[in-house]
């Protein structure tokens, strides 16, 4: 209550309470522009107009709440009760007229009801269909990054670069927010998943089916300007395979329409052309609100099927210069040749190498910036509101990542980051005006905003893009530069 004071007089002798209240009402309460509100054994003096109803509205907007549960026993709580609507629940505690929908008489019952509500919410979050964060695998081409769930589902991918709008965001909004899934037609919930050697090429295996996923790193793509990216999915084995292609433009905020073309699919009406090359797949388009989803079923008989999601081109023709199998080989070689040069410790060497590969995958090749994460809005605590967009380059965090790779014998990332940071310093109005974070291209991060269309990971809202920390003063920002 930064603009008011509350005078409580519960558990005070009546004569002393009466005297204190009289002095307050004949004193400060009579001053100009002081607003007085009386409740149960409390008097509030405020210098601005405010109420519990205003507070409810502000909190609802701040956390993106879809419903509010409010218990109150005071006359001042009526301001909150009258603001509740729709699925909200209002409960009056005690006697007296009230705008609340429900009533309980025993204050101790409030604790019991809240405990039951907390238990139900905890069970909901634990049982939500959210794959544990640590079970996701990372794909990267040094510009675009994607997450793959244990069932070979692309659940997160932004393009044309890591901090761009999401094309698939099931991670934060469930299936309706977009995914790209390959799975056996007959359900099998126990696939095995592992990286192919010391690389970011991922293999998901069922008894009769293997899906190999990678973002193409051949032909120098990791250091090329963002805008042309290929996600390749190679399907091998025998039996019937179900493919679900459900892109959702801009986190699902824009209608996503698909066009069936010879050799694959095209996402209609996009700023940058996006196509899915899928030779031999017969597609059915399903209407899902303002979006369309393509579903195809293919029977494999030993020959591999290769799907190519091409961002930045409208061509569905087969690439002659570098066929998918050669790009697979070169992408694997790109990661393994880098990992082979690391000076790994004797203890837990494979785990350290895998961690180093993740850090390398977070390096933005065209400029040298290093992002803090490939994602936005994964919660610090399930159900909480501390869900931030970390798809940017913090001077401090990036310096720590570069330092870790230097300790393992890889210096190129630190040199590239230094070039990125020097460019940021050159553009700064003055050294003391350095911000804690910048985009991967070294420019100011946009204003923080919330995406109300997404329910959040395991119900953790709000989902944010941008980061308000850009306006903070963090003195440790000068350490990495020094």
What are these regions (language model features)?
Residues 11-12, 75, 97, 161, ...:
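Short, glycine/serine-rich, charged loops/turns that create anion-binding
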Residues 30-31, 85, 365:
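Short, well-ordered coil/turn elements that cap or connect secondary structure elements
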Residues 2, 65-67, 87, 238, ...:
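A general structural motif
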Residues 53-125:
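Mg2+-dependent phosphoryl-transfer enzymes with acidic/Ser/Thr/Gly-rich catalytic loops
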Residues 125-482:
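Acidic, mature catalytic/reactive cores of soluble proteins
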Residues 1-48:
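HAD-like small-molecule phosphatases
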Residues 5-6, 42-45, 98-99, 109-112, ...:
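A short acidic, often aromatic-flanked loop/helix-cap motif at beta-alpha or helix-coil junctions
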């Amino acid at each position: 209550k930064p603009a008011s004071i509350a005078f409580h007089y519960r558990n005070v002798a009546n004569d002393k309470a009466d005297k204190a209240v009289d002095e307050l009402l004949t004193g400060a309460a009579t001053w100009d522009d002081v607003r007085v509100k009386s409740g149960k054994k409390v008097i509030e003096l405020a210098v601005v107009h405010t109420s519990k109803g205003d507070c409810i509205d502000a909190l609802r907007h701040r956390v993106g709440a879809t419903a509010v549960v409010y218990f109150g026993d005071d006359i001042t709580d009526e301001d909150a009760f009258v603001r509740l609507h729709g699925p909200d629940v209002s409960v009056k505690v005690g006697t007296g007229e009230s705008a609340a929908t429900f009533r309980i008489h025993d204050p101790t019952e409030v604790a019991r009801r809240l405990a039951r509500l907390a238990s139900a919410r905890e069970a909901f979050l634990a049982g939500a269909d959210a794959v544990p964060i640590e079970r996701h695998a990372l794909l990267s081409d040094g510009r675009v990054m994607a997450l793959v769930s244990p069932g070979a589902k692309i659940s997160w991918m932004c393009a044309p670069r890591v901090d761009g709008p999401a094309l698939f965001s099931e991670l934060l909004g469930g299936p309706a927010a977009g995914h790209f899934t390959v799975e056996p037609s007959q359900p099998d919930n126990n696939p095995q998943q592992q990286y192919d050697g010391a690389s970011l090429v991922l293999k998901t295996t069922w008894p009769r089916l293997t899906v190999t996923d990678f973002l193409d790193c051949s032909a120098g793509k990791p250091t090329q300007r963002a805008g042309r990216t290929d996600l390749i999915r190679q399907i091998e084995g025998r039996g019937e395979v179900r493919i679900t292609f459900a892109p959702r433009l801009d986190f699902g905020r824009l209608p996503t329409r698909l066009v069936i073309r010879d050799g694959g699919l095209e996402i209609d009406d996009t700023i940058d052309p996006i196509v899915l090359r899928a030779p031999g797949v017969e597609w059915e388009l399903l209407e899902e609100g303002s979006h369309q989803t393509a579903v195809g079923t293919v029977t494999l008989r030993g020959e591999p099927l290769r799907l190519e999601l091409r961002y930045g081109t409208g061509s569905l023709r087969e690439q002659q210069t570098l066929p998918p199998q050669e790009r697979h080989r070169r992408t694997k070689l790109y990661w393994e040749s880098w990992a082979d040069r690391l000076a790994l410790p004797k203890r837990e060497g494979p785990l350290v190498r895998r961690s180093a590969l993740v850090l390398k995958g977070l390096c933005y090749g065209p400029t040298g910036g290093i992002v803090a994460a490939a994602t936005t809005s994964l919660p610090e605590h399930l159900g909480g509101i501390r869900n931030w967009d970390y798809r940017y380059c913090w001077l401090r965090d990036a310096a720590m990542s570069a330092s870790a790779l230097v300790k393992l014998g890889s210096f190129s990332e630190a040199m590239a980051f230094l070039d990125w940071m020097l460019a940021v310093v050159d553009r700064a109005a003055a050294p003391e005006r350095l911000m804690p974070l910048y985009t991967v291209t070294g420019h100011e991060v946009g204003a923080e905003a919330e995406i109300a269309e997404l329910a959040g990971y395991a119900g953790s809202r709000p989902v944010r893009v941008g980061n308000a920390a850009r306006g903070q003063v963090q003195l440790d920002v000068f350490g990495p530069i020094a």
